């Protein structure tokens, strides 16, 4: 155990976050997401909701400042509905952890899947909210 590291972060997830470079993306996927059929680098975070993962990850993670929206979520399929509180819950978790909320946009379902295939890794969470997936784009970490 490391001091100052959120207990929701597994050693595998910490290693992955450290390996990622600027411009790399990571998918925080809900429990329904077809992670293993879309990606070879899948990390399990069973039982942990995405808002908790966001609270744990974002203090360690610089958001990409060179894109309009470093956060991407999945749009509901036409005729289906999604709970707007999911997005609010995620943005509140980020705000709570880092003091601001980066821009967020949404992608159609299959565009989201295509983008997820290109990500550095997919983290399968215990999130059960429908359309509860989010992609985070890593930025350049400032040198202090």
Swiss-Prot record:
The protein's Enzyme Commission number: 5.1.3.29
Subcellular location: Cytoplasm
Job description of the protein: Involved in the anomeric conversion of L-fucose.
Keywords from the named record: Carbohydrate metabolism, Cytoplasm, Fucose metabolism, Isomerase
Amino-acid positions noted as binding substrate in the UniProt annotation, renumbered to this chain: 30, 109, 131-133
Protein known as: L-fucose mutarotase
Positions annotated as active site in the UniProt record: 22
InterPro entries referenced in this protein's UniProt entry, alphabetically: L-fucose_mutarotase, RbsD-like_sf, RbsD/FucU_mutarotase, RbsD_FucU
Entry's Gene Ontology molecular function annotations: fucose binding; L-fucose mutarotase activity
Protein's pathway: Carbohydrate metabolism; L-fucose metabolism
One Pfam family it belongs to: RbsD_FucU
Record GO cellular component, one term: cytoplasm
Catalytic activity line of the entry: alpha-L-fucose = beta-L-fucose
Similarity field: Belongs to the RbsD / FucU family. FucU mutarotase subfamily.
Entry keyword Isomerase: yes
Record text on subunit structure and interactions: Homodecamer.
Signal peptide residue numbers: none
BP terms from Gene Ontology: fucosylation; L-fucose metabolic process
TM stretches of this protein: none
SS bond list: none
PANTHER family with a match to the protein in the record: FUCOSE MUTAROTASE
Keyword Cytoplasm on entry: yes
Domain of life the protein comes from: Bacteria
């Amino acid at each position: 155990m490391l001091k100052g590291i959120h207990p929701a972060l597994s050693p595998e997830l910490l290693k992955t976050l450290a390996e990622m470079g600027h411009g790399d993306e990571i998918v925080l996927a809900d429990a329904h997401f077809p992670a293993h059929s879309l990606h070879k680098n899948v990390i399990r975070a069973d039982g942990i909701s995405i808002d908790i993962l966001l609270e744990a990850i974002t203090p360690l993670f610089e958001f990409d400042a060179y894109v309009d929206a470093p956060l991407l979520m999945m749009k509901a399929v036409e005729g289906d509905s999604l709970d707007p509180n999911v997005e609010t819950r995620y943005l509140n978790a980020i705000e709570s952890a880092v003091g601001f909320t980066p821009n967020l946009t949404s992608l159609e379902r299959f565009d989201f899947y295509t983008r997820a295939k290109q990500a550095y890794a997919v983290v399968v969470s215990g999130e059960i909210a429908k359309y509860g997936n989010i992609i985070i784009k890593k930025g350049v970490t400032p040198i202090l």
